Amino acid sequence: RNLLTWAMRLGGGPAIVPVALAAVLGVLTVRLSNDAALRPLRSALLSSVLLFAAGGVIGVFIHGSNVRIPAHYHGSIVGVTLALMGAVYRILPALGYQAPQGRMATLQPWLYGMGQLMHIIGLVWSGGYGVQRKVAGTDQVLRSTAEVAGMGLMGLGGLIAIIGGLLFVVVVLRAMRQPQAVSH
């Protein structure tokens, strides 16, 4: 068990930092070109790195069994999910569909990511007050306004993330409705 924890800390932390920095530096360099077709990809990558980093940082501060634990893995998993959303945006043209474009395609990863960031901040906040994981409703025994506010932020963030997830489906379906323009 200790070996697994050690491997997670080494592989999930220091090993990822150089890759994340390279990705962010690459995006910032590409940003100078201001190519509208790259905006949705840039949004997905930056929000992915942000959420994955938040999940990693939260993992460092886990003590005991409370809702900080699901905050950690929600951040990490959502970071990967956002990267996969960006990958879908990238491969659609290779499959013969239009590349997702426009404001909705650019804002969708940020909406999903910011909703999830609110979700995990609410969990970390409540976890700081000792709110237990794997319990719901009255069993949570939310004793203070701060605990209720943290869980409320978690719920609001979750709702925003659901809307962002549904927008991902809308963006992809719109791109798939129109075949890719053939260049001669």
Named regions from a protein language model:
Residues 83, 119, 161:
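Short, electropositive, low-hydrophobicity segments enriched in small/polar residues
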